[in-house]
């Protein structure tokens, strides 16, 4: 599980939310099993519970996540910078968007730890199905992130006529590892 702290986030995110907690499951069956067990458990708790300090309200979203670029190895950092873009597909297929994301390490450099494509399945504001994707790149270190941003600004690319996507201004996050399990 990752707690995402917004550092410089586009849109109205910071007006509405303080942070995001992201849970990753290998399948919907695994998610249903674990979330059902979590909701069914009984008993007390000592100290604060999440609901004592945070309210999710109607904002829960369930996304499909495709790991376009697996981990570059080594231990997962406790805090890692990440960048995210939300893009309109404008006719580009979801499978092509996922395939394109596999090249992100070539574009951003070797310090990209992981890259994935996010597509909303349930919740959040209404929108046409498979019309948008999010791209997220997580870096091994702050220095690696800085090198990637320098690479982007030093190598501005012209629009690709074969890629109809349009993307919003990116967002910068600090990803805090709060739990990891290899299941």
Residues of each region from the PLM?
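Acidic/polar, glycine-enriched structural segments that form the non-catalytic walls/loops
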Residues: 48
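Short S/T/G/P-rich N-terminal loop/turn motif that feeds into the first structured element of a domain
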Residues: 1-41, 52-183
């Amino acid at each position: 599980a990752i707690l995402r702290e917004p550092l410089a986030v586009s849109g109205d995110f910071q007006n509405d939310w303080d942070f995001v907690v992201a849970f990753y499951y290998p399948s919907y069956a695994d998610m249903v099993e674990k979330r059902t067990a979590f909701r069914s458990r009984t008993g007390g708790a000592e100290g604060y519970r999440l609901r004592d300090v945070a309210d999710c309200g109607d904002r829960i979203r369930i996304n499909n996540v495709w790991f376009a670029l697996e981990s570059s190895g080594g231990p997962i950092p406790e805090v890692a910078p990440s960048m995210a873009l939300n893009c309109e597909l404008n006719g580009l297929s979801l499978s092509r968007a996922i395939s394109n994301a596999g090249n992100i390490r070539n574009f951003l450099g070797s310090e990209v730890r992981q890259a994935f494509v996010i597509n909303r399945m349930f919740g959040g504001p209404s929108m046409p199905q498979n019309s948008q994707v999010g791209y997220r790149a997580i870096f091994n270190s702050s220095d690696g992130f800085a090198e990637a941003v320098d690479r982007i600004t030093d190598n501005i690319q012209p629009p690709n006529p074969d890629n109809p996507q349009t993307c919003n201004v990116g967002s910068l996050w600090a990803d805090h590892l709060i739990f990891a399990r290899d299941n």
